[in-house]
UniProtKB/Swiss-Prot annotation:
Keywords: DNA recombination, DNA-binding, Transcription, Transcription regulation, Translation regulation
Highest classification ranks of the organism: Bacteria, Pseudomonadati, Pseudomonadota, Gammaproteobacteria, Moraxellales
Function: This protein is one of the two subunits of integration host factor, a specific DNA-binding protein that functions in genetic recombination as well as in transcriptional and translational control.
Gene Ontology MF annotations: DNA binding; structural constituent of chromatin
Protein name from the UniProt record: Integration host factor subunit alpha
Cross-referenced SUPFAM superfamilies: IHF-like DNA-binding proteins
PROSITE patterns documented for this protein: HISTONE_LIKE
CDD domains: IHF_A
Length: 98
């Protein structure tokens, strides 16, 4: 299984548009920066036909060191969640697996 990288996205964008590779790379970076900044500002990011990104706060909870069995607290933190939209789930779910 291969991975799609930001560089791959920029290359594909430059092939489909009149942007050169440098401009396409900047466009991809700006896209992800915009999503990051919106999440940092506490906004929900809704991409129609794709899905929603949201920042959630997780409370502190008890955990366990798997090597020693010692109980340790897992600190509170913020996590990014993604919920795929219905159209996206249908499109991905209907693809054939080789």
């Amino acid at each position: 299984m291969t991975a799609l990288t930001k560089a791959d996205m920029a290359d594909h964008l430059s092939e489909l548009t009149s942007l050169n590779r440098r401009e396409a790379k900047q466009m991809v970076e700006l896209f992800f920066d915009e999503i990051s900044q919106a999440l940092i500002a506490g906004e929900q990011v809704k991409l129609s036909g794709f899905g929603n990104f949201e920042l959630r706060d997780k409370r502190e909870r008890p955990g366990r060191n798997p090597k020693t069995g010692e109980e340790i607290p897992i600190s509170a933190r913020r996590v990014v969640t993604f919920r795929a939209g219905q159209k996206f789930r249908q499109r991905v779910g209907n693809e054939q697996i080789d």
